[in-house]
Amino acid sequence: MKPIHTEPAATGISAHCQVPGPRSIPFSSLAGVRVGNVQDDAAATGVTVYRLTSPGRAAVVVLGGGPASRETESIAPERNHPLNALVFSGGSAYGLAASGGVARCLEDHGVGYDTGIAVVPIVCQSCIYDLGFGSASLRPDERMGYAACKATFSSNDPRSGNVGAGTGATVGKAAGMRQAQKAGIGYAAAQMGSLQLGVAVVLNSFGDIYADGKKIAGMLTPDRSDFADSYLSTLQSAEENLFTSTTNTTLAAVFTNGDFTPAQLKHLAQMASAGFARCIVPAFTTADGDTVYAISVGPDKDKVAASLDAVGALSAKLTEEAIADAVYSAQVH
């Protein structure tokens, strides 16, 4: 499934927004987080692990109607358990098994909360629904989760496109998979002084994708020769039960060395979600499980005081960048 607008991948914040100060940096240069991927290309599914090098404060907002998640209550502001790793995967709710492998890998490396009896890692996870693109019976499991986590101890691999959790991602599914297009996982990062900010997006939406007001991927006509319109299709089905299943979901994670409380991080995640609304039409539907995390990485002594509003505004722009990257980096199918 080939995007009709085959522009090059987004090259950084300067390509898509006019914000003075921030400069684009590689996601791999972010301090405090390491990325590992494992995928089954034949089954078109996979796992991406974001391992924090120090336990981090985190928060999450769920904006879609059908999330598949693990341990999100443990990072609620009123609980504030330090996070050790975030997992994105395919497989829908079946894919949650991958976190068991991540937790076991972290335990093997002595990472987690020491209860005095055992080390217990805090691992959050969210999944996309990719069962309709590849194999519905082969899903991410504990073995894949362990391997993806293990990779973070020897390398740092934030590749874009059809890798890890983005292997089976698609967009524009208002008329089903036959008129959908391929997407994947995308990244964008920026630095202002000593403040670093990066966004990862696994793009697997019901809706169409826009960049700078132009549609770049989404629902196609039945003969796949041009774009159709998911928004109009949704309106035309207003009296029908269009959303018969929650077979989509876009995931995002904001990583920053900014010194924010869990409550502030939740607000940061909400501000970052504006990037979804700008790029995905329609967004946050009952057919999606859209979920956004915000995580403060690195040791507390190294965190940077920063304006929540400024970081939130920039995170929304970087979310737009990461969404475009997820489209332009996707393989042609």
Language model features by range: what are they?
Residues 101-106:
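Active-site-adjacent structural elements in enzyme catalytic domains
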